[in-house]
Amino acid sequence: MPKRTDIQKIMVIGSGPIIIGQAAEFDYAGTQACLSLKEEGYEVVLVNSNPATIMTDKEIADKVYIEPITLEFVTRILRKEGPDALLPTLGGQTGLNMAMELSKNGILDELGVELLGTKLSAIDQAEDRDLFKQLMEELEQPIPESEIVNTVEEAVAFAATIGYPVIVRPAFTLGGTGGGMCANEKELREITENGLKLSPVTQCLIERSIAGFKEIEYEVMRDSADNALVVCNMENFDPVGIHTGDSIVFAPAQTMSDYENQMLRDASLSIIRALKIEGGCNVQLALDPNSFKYYVIEVNPRVSRSSALASKATGYPIAKLAAKIAVGLTLDEVINPVTGSTYAMFEPALDYVVAKIPRFPFDKFEKGERRLGTQMKATGEVMAIGRNIEESLLKACRSLEIGVHHNEIPELAAVSDDTLIEKVVKAQDDRLFYVSEAIRRGYTPEEIAELTKIDIFYLDKLLHIFEIEQELGAHPQDLEVLKTAKLNGFSDRKIAELWGTTDDKVRQLRLENKIVPVYKMVDTCAAEFDSETPYFYSTYGWENESIKSDKESVLVLGSGPIRIGQGVEFDYATVHSVKAIQAAGYEAIIMNSNPETVSTDFSVSDKLYFEPLTFEDVMNVIDLEQPKGVIVQFGGQTAINLAEPLAKAGVTILGTQVADLDRAEDRDLFEQALKELDIPQPPGQTATNEEEAALAARKIGFPVLVRPSYVLGGRAMEIVENEEDLRSYMRTAVKASPDHPVLVDSYIVGQECEVDAISDGKNVLIPGIMEHIERAGVHSGDSMAVYPPQTLSQKVQETIADYTKRLAIGLHCLGMMNIQFVIKDEKVYVIEVNPRASRTVPFLSKVTNIPMAQVATKLILGQSLSELGYQNGLYPESTRVHIKAPVFSFTKLAKVDSLLGPEMKSTGEVMGSDATLEKALYKAFEASYLHLPTFGNVVFTIADDAKEEALNLARRFQNIGYGILATEGTAAFFASHGLQAQPVGKIGDDDKDIPSFVRKGRIQAIINTVGTKRTADEDGEQIRRSAIEHGVPLFTALDTANAMLKVLESRSFVTEAI
């Protein structure tokens, strides 16, 4: 069926900010879909609140609205644009829920907007637990015994009839939010209560647990002519019971018989046909390893995290084709862009194995609950491709960037057998490493399979890896064993460890004996047809399929898996850099390991290498491609950390040179540079042990800010008030050493702001200054940023511009740099300089209309700012006000404290833009799901040093009609200043404490600040947790509360008697 001509204008809803469970895979899907629809000649209108994505670039759609994805704003845009149709299936759960809401409120009917892709009835049938159950019964598809409940008591009664363990699944939530496995009634009560609150329809499904079955996923596609096919099946290494987003996954599935595959394939295709989905869909099934019994777990009627993985694993572009199907094209009419010759109706065939390993944020959240279950906790993932399981698994391990280069964490060797077995059974984020350690200690695959229900097939592979380790240890320098190890994915570093030599010597031995990798093409058809995709992975075998072209090339290093502190913003910069390299006439080569992102879409670059970002893997590509140079400044800390070893190996680093990178990162060199340039910084010193730190702090005076050097995202940074706290920090938080000193700085409480600058070595372009709403002390990634600045004097802005120019030229910066300043009493201090692209690049690029990463890349390749038409200095300001606001994923991370400080905690961001500060703030708060009703109660629980300031806020809240509640000390302080607040108990005061008020819905916002002492603030933590669990707006910085007040004041009227 040809494409539809009765519709011209289509609105696409994006997925909003990145949160755990909904990450960069939707930027990739949305970008593909918008371009795919434009290619077919439709006018595309995009709504998405996330500025950090490629998807919200002007070129991606005909009209791009970076506005909140809420009923209020989406309705406005629908009325203004009057599209014929709406495509919501590429915006994750956010897009689907928005479509449901628009429909339920009658907006789609009123405006005559048709829904494309998936009908509302199908969304309902897949998402509403009751309707899903009915449909499965009609199709005679087995599902676990279950019951829908709306109260905790109903849940307890049902569990009594089927027995524990049971699983709780709230309806219409994302990434298993609020769900979990319950072994007894106490856990069931707790999880169901929370699940009912988080479900928008107050509904949970209680089902019999089938934990221990194999978890299999099928990624399927269907068109309007009822053609349907399986793109790819995938098998979880971890059995059912751990969220698939937190599981290690292999594609294609490895342990199913032909009969089992056929059985589950038929089930998946019959489900997508029954739901009449036009586009992509993901079906999750549980297979009993001991019989042919299976259950359908769930269906996602949309593009998902698994579809991004399936697209990258097979090369089959699911989102692109889903968009074409949505407008009426059929699979037998669309050419598969990978082969360029076969139709999309051919099912992909793979002649390799793909491994995906999730990346968790527990390096930032040491207190977080690491036990894995049905609620997702990973922030990102890595993928690796190999010719066997061992190779793809080990390549994926070293892609994770958690300080491992093999499937082992050396520290685990010291763990007792009891602890080891407990960690093997009770899965945490690092279970793979504990299982591998158990094998090294002689536990058999059979014993481990019995304990974990992991298929023995995979455990045999781990045993095989261990056997190769022993072989290597027994035969140093043996070329045959070396070849075997390389065929199975071993890194040079691991081999060097086992041989007691250096990585360099192993590399030399390999090169001398021509033991080098070949690169194979990902072609969707197991080499049956000719393919034209420049998409490669390395393996040790024969026949290299990646041919170096005659054109001069430039290699760009990506930023690896998404984690807190290094998010999709860096992928954004990478993609823009590639565009500029191509525009300059070079061949652009990308190397990255993240399957969720736009940069690993093979149509973005001239060549894509899907490889770990380690020195060895990067050098292998450089040896083959011989590029003009490597660009490291867009790949975050990942790429910057590779600059030095690459330069030592003789590779040309394009842009700022290694010595200058060092001057910005190394504390003593940086201080020296600032002295020479006559730029003030807060007084500070470096310390390599506890005594030195105490001495430095006494000299500088408390409070001090302490942190390790060379980190991204403020890891292990703290503000300490006294010597006792400082000593405790030095003992527990960091491993200080002469190689890794700790920085001790005077902590200046002032206004913070940051600048991104682009330099060609002579001139410096400053696109804009961003002013932070929160004072210094909250990590810049967690602060709300305002552009253009609203409170900085002209003099301060000129000083900032002057210091920025001096720094860029003085540090010989070529390309991008980011500088953070703090201002106190009109004096400007430099806090830090990052000689690379920062996380504010996408936001600032969008609000100033300067494609910053592209400009920087052109300068790196030799053009000048004046040639590109840019002036030296600060770029003219925008007339509108733009705000970048952080978004957090605390609901997903139990035991993580939501208090903001110098260590970054946000996972994503949104943008609000309007004519005034108040309106822009309103949009930013709405987009980040911080919605405050216009009346109700605000509770204050404030540390002594901030009570004065809080009093003023409380008065303003009272003036616009809010009730004020406060904890004992705060209430007494307010009363002594003539403001009566209703006192509330802190914690444990039965039904008079804050958490019970929150549960009863009597509190609309919580304002809670903490002193800077390092004492455990358990009460405060419980109060903050109760706010997170019940979705009550929580402010841990008075500046943010003040910003919210500005919004409320601008929207409220004062009513007074005359």
UniProtKB/Swiss-Prot annotation:
Residues binding ATP 1, per UniProt: R129, R169, G175, G176, R208, I210, E215, G241, I242, H243, Q284, E298
Function: Large subunit of the glutamine-dependent carbamoyl phosphate synthetase (CPSase). CPSase catalyzes the formation of carbamoyl phosphate from the ammonia moiety of glutamine, carbonate, and phosphate donated by ATP, constituting the first step of 2 biosynthetic pathways, one leading to arginine and/or urea and the other to pyrimidine nucleotides.
Domain spans labelled MGS-like: 930-1058
Organism per entry: Streptococcus pneumoniae (strain CGSP14)
The EC number(s) this enzyme carries: 6.3.4.16, 6.3.5.5
Named cofactor requirement(s): Mg(2+); Mn(2+)
Superkingdom to which the source organism belongs: Bacteria
Ranges for domain ATP-grasp: 133-327, 671-861
Catalytic reaction annotation: hydrogencarbonate + L-glutamine + 2 ATP + H2O = carbamoyl phosphate + L-glutamate + 2 ADP + phosphate + 2 H(+)
Protein name in the entry: Carbamoyl phosphate synthase large chain
Chain positions recorded as Mn(2+) 4 binding sites: E832, N834
Binding site for Mg(2+) 1: Q284, E298
Enzyme class: ligase
PANTHER family to which the protein is assigned, alphabetical: CARBAMOYL-PHOSPHATE SYNTHASE [AMMONIA], MITOCHONDRIAL, CARBAMOYLTRANSFERASE FAMILY MEMBER
Positions of region (Allosteric domain): 930-1058
Residue numbers binding Mg(2+) 2: E298, N300
Binding site residues for Mg(2+) 3: Q820, E832
Gene designation per UniProt: carB
Sequence segments annotated as region (Carbamoyl phosphate synthetic domain): 547-929
Complexes and interactors: Composed of two chains; the small (or glutamine) chain promotes the hydrolysis of glutamine to ammonia, which is used by the large (or ammonia) chain to synthesize carbamoyl phosphate. Tetramer of heterodimers (alpha,beta)4.
Residues the entry annotates as binding Mn(2+) 3: Q820, E832
Region annotation Oligomerization domain: where it falls in the sequence: 402-546
Binding site for Mn(2+) 2: E298, N300
Biological pathway: Amino-acid biosynthesis; L-arginine biosynthesis; carbamoyl phosphate from bicarbonate: step 1/1; Pyrimidine metabolism; UMP biosynthesis via de novo pathway; (S)-dihydroorotate from bicarbonate: step 1/3
Residues that coordinate or bind Mg(2+) 4: E832, N834
Alphabetical keyword list: Amino-acid biosynthesis, Arginine biosynthesis, ATP-binding, Ligase, Magnesium, Manganese, Metal-binding, Nucleotide-binding, Pyrimidine biosynthesis, Repeat
